[in-house]
Each structure stands twice: as structure tokens, then as C-alpha cells.
Amino acid sequence: MNLDDWLAHCERLHPVAIDMGLARVQAVADRLALKFEGPVITVAGTNGKGSTCAMLEAILSEAGYRTGVYTSPHLVHFEERCRVAGEIVEPEALVPHFERVAQAREDVSLTYFEFTTLAILSLLADKQLDVVILEVGLGGRLDAVNIIDSDCAIVTSVDLDHMAYLGNDRETIGREKAGIFRTGRPAIVSDPVPPQSVLDRAVEIGADLWRMGHDFNYAGDKQQWSWSGRGRRYSGLAYPALRGANQLMN
């Protein structure tokens, strides 16, 4: 089977496209014994996830780190969801990992997103990466990506999205996204006016909360920008290649 065959197979496995919960995907992940050598950064949020992942990848790569990135959805080809050392992986490289997931799942039913997420995580775990960057697909708390205990969690923004699955207001949705936070680890919130539920979750579990406008901030003019936070300041920074007024916030 090639990658297209596996993707078609994944579409037929589960009775519904979205099935919130981690029990099934966690059971298969345990059988796969997924383990990353370096730190993992997980990014959630209504908007800005993809841009944040791209800029993290660029910064870390420029600093000499070997990166792995998982984002979704893709624009044209499925393999766009996975990059290693800045390059999109070849379709053929993913096939053995789809086979691994198929063997590990046995009788466990997985959605398309759960199956494909596990396959990409399996590939990234085999690549001896310095840093792994994971983009949440939907929400955070019950997203398949959240089976990985990340070393740093980022919530870019919280707005009304996927309300049928995440809730009808920012407070409820915010708590879902804050589900990626971990005790004692950095939890970065770049929404300038985050829901109280996001802040409460960080305090509740003892995460190291970094809040825009409190723990860090930025300023810019027509030619350059600066960042400051917790006793550090970086000035004279060049604007990112990604254009838009919101990109400095990302």
C-alpha cells in the first residue's frame, strides 16, 4: 500500500470523523512506545498556530537545531503536514509508520486524524530531533496531539471556533485549549485578553504562566521591533517574512 492507499483506509476505519477523547489514541500510543529525544513544543489557539509553528521552526533551525514539525491541515499533499530539518517528508517515508500504527492498534478504532497523527509522531520519534513542534488540530485537551506531554505549551489566541465540539463561549473554549498546559512547564499565552479560564487552568496545575502584556511584551516601528520579558530585552529585530499586523504577536 502507498500513502494514498493508507489515507483512504484511514477514512473508512471509524464511524465518525471527529470523536473527542484520548483513551483510544493513548492506548495505541502506549503500544507504539513513542519517545522523543529532545523537548516538545505544543501550539494551540484559534488563529496563529501555523504562523507560530513556522516561526519557531525558522528560529530554531537558524540556531542550529534539527527540528521536526507536525501541522494540519495540508494545502495540497498530505505529506505537507510533516517537516524534518525544514524539508517536507517524502510520502514513502510515512508508509512504514502507517504500518506500525495498523499493527499496534489491533482492534482499537481510530479516526482519520488520530491514525495519521500517530503515524507522523512515530516518524518524528525515529528521527533523533533536537526539538519537535506540534500543532493542535482541534481544541487542545482532547486533541490527539495532547497524548504527548510537551515541555512548553503555547496558546496563541482564543475565539469562537468549532463550537459544536469545544463550547459556546470563550471561557469554555479557552479551558479546552489550556488543556495542553503541564505542571511546572512554560505555558505561553499570547492572547492580549485571554479568557479567565486559561489563566485559572495554569494556576490550578502549577504551570509556569507567561502572559502577553505581563510577563513579556513587544513594540515595533516602521523598520524594526523589540521584545522584552522577565529581565531580558532584544532590540533592533528585523520583521518576520510572514506579513501581517498580528505576526509580531505570534
Name each model-derived stretch:
Residues V16-I18, L22-E37, E62-I148, A164-L166, ...:
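ATP-dependent carboxylate-amine ligase catalytic core
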Residues M1-N47, S51-R66, L75-V76, E92, ...:
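N-terminal leader/targeting and accessory segments in enzymes
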Residues T67, L242-N250:
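Short glycine/threonine-rich catalytic loop with a Thr-x-Gly-x-Asp
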Residues V40, T67-V69, I147, A153, ...:
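Conserved beta-strand scaffold positions in the cores of enzyme catalytic domains, especially
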Residues E11, S61, A102, L199, ...:
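Class I S-adenosyl-L-methionine
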Residues R105-L110, Y239-A245:
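A short glycine/serine-rich beta->alpha loop
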Residues L56, I120, V198, A202:
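Aromatic/hydrophobic pocket-lining residues that form π-stacking "cages" and hydrophobic walls in ligand
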Residues Q128-E135, S150-A241:
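Acidic, Mg2+-coordinating active-site environments of NTP-dependent enzymes
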